[in-house]
């Protein structure tokens, strides 16, 4: 099933980040590794995005348009990246489930998200304008 394979990518990423926290920290700081100049990194990232896009297209077919599939891909990426960052930075003792190892919390959270992803794609927020991202420009003091 495509969503099972899609979830497997996320589970593998979380396992890798947990097993290699220093490597995760280095590659997640793109300015430190000059990401823009690395053809290998760009190709690798494009390849995994293409696989994720294909799996979502297989999973949803006509149920979700290309934009909805892109939003699902971004949400999944943000979730696994955020979970990996939280694990590597040691946030789970305060945010995790009591008496449960971090690895289990990571897996359970991703599985929870995948369950939501496979559910009705209707909007989850009230109608109205979408929130805007904060500006990165520095404000004068």
Question: Language-model segments: what does each one mean?
Answer:
Residues 29:
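Phosphate-coordinating loops and pocket residues in cytosolic domains that bind phosphorylated ligands
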Residues 32:
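Positions that flank functional sites
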Residues 35-42, 46, 59-111, 120-141:
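Hydrophobic/aromatic-rich alpha-helical bundle segments in the mid-to-C-terminal region
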Residues 1-23, 45-47, 66, 72-76:
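Hydrophobic alpha-helical connector segments
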Residues 10, 14, 49, 53, ...:
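Hydrophobic core segments within long, regular secondary-structure runs in both alpha-
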């Amino acid at each position: 099933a495509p969503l099972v394979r899609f979830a497997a990518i996320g589970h593998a990423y979380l396992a890798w980040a947990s097993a290699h926290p220093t490597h995760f920290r280095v590659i997640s700081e793109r300015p430190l590794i000059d990401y823009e100049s690395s053809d290998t990194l760009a190709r690798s990232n494009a390849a995994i995005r293409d696989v994720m896009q294909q799996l979502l297209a297989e999973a949803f077919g006509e149920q979700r348009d290309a934009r909805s599939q892109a939003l699902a891909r971004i949400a999944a990426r943000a979730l696994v990246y955020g979970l990996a960052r939280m694990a590597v930075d040691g946030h789970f003792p305060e945010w995790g489930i009591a008496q449960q190892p971090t690895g289990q919390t990571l897996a359970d959270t991703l599985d929870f998200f995948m369950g939501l992803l496979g559910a009705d794609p209707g909007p989850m927020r009230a109608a109205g304008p979408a929130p805007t991202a904060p500006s990165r420009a520095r404000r004068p003091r």
